[in-house]
Amino acid sequence: MLLKPEEDPGLPSAYRPISLTNTISKLMEKLVVKMYNQHIQKTLPNSQAGFRPGSEINDQLLKVINPIETAFRKRFITTIAALDVQKAFDTMWHDGLRFKLATNNMPPHFTRWVSHFLTNRSAKVAVHGELSQSFPMKAGAPQGSAISPTLYNLFVADIPQPFHPRVGLAQFADDTCYWATGNHTPNAYRLLNDQLVRYTNWTNKWRITINPDKTQAMLIRPTGRTIDPQKYRVQLHNQPIQYQPTMKYLGLTISNKLSLLPHLRATLKKTKLPLQTIRFLSQKNTKCPAKVRIHLYKCLIRPLFTYATPLLINYNQSQLEKLCLEERRILKICLKLPKTTPNILVYALAGLKPLPEYLNLTNKIYITRALNKPALPDMLHNPHPDTILHKLSLL
């Protein structure tokens, strides 16, 4: 059992059960997925990007942000809901999955193998050396199993697709996001709520539980358009979801004005803990070489600064400079340099490219890679001016 981040250790619901299947089982699971991968990919909808070959989080983030940003530049309204599936992997209905595999033209051998894989599973819980009695697992895909993400993707493959051109859907495994745009708030609000009714009917049918307390909703509107948010609230199971000024989806935090300032603040906050480790190793009485401290920075902190690199092209000059200042401050700690050390010398001694140069190079590599993917070239063709995709296309 693993404690979930920022949860109360005294609550049983704060722990995530992890199943450590043996090596032979994991090998077999990977072989099965590889053998039937062509059938699996044909079954999954284009909205699903999680745990699929050739897909990455940046693609999905762009798929969500691009239509919303385009609507924003056209002074349209967008309502968006990021849905939280409660214990998604742990509550997957076994018989429901069997039915879907059998009716989606999956090979019978694959369906039977999956059925046997999920049959007669049991678990025990150990706490302080005390072992509970064995109990049957009547639902759920074993977390830690190599095939579980694929099984969950197949289970939710028939998710209700957008019923209107101005409604969008993005999935990354159990992370589900619907949005709707309109020239007026009532239009966007009505489209999204109609889509969510279809979605909740589907979740009820397949025993999927949505946690309304962790579901996020946001109303994105251009400056100057005054709207009463309380009048047009998103509803889930007839329960209103409070609009938030910011939303976090797949690790990216944006505001209702599409600003990345909340993401920058969250990023800088995340650096505090790894920076404490680097500070400790930079003390006089430690014998940790500078090369190791720089390596720790590259492994623990720079990935935080460069997460979702294509989206970071929307940082304004002030926000990017804050990130660069923090990077140089950390590098000076790693190298034990005075605060007045020139920036060129800091990067030369660290053996690193300056952050803006590194981000620019990474984006060029991403665009080259994205042009060979089926969906992104269409998005990159003639993007709306002053959007992320337009800026990327100019690199």
Tell where the protein language model's regions lie, with residue ranges:
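Short, conserved micro-motifs composed of acidic
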Residues: L131, D194, T209-P245
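Flexible, low-complexity interdomain linkers flanking nucleic-acid-processing modules
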Residues: Y232-V234, N238, T362-L395
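Non-catalytic, peripheral interaction segments enriched in hydrophobic/basic residues
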Residues: F172-A173, N204-I227, K248-L371
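Active-site palm subdomain of RNA-directed nucleic acid polymerases
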Residues: V32-Q48, R73, P149-W179
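Mobile genetic element proteins and their domesticated derivatives, centered on retroelements
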Residues: R16, M28, V32, Y36, ...
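Conserved pre-catalytic core of RNA-dependent polymerases
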Residues: M1-P142, A180
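Catalytic palm active-site di-aspartate
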Residues: R16-P17, Q48-G50, I80-A88, V114, ...
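Catalytic palm subdomain of template-directed nucleic-acid polymerases
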Residues: A88-N104, C177-N201, S259, N314
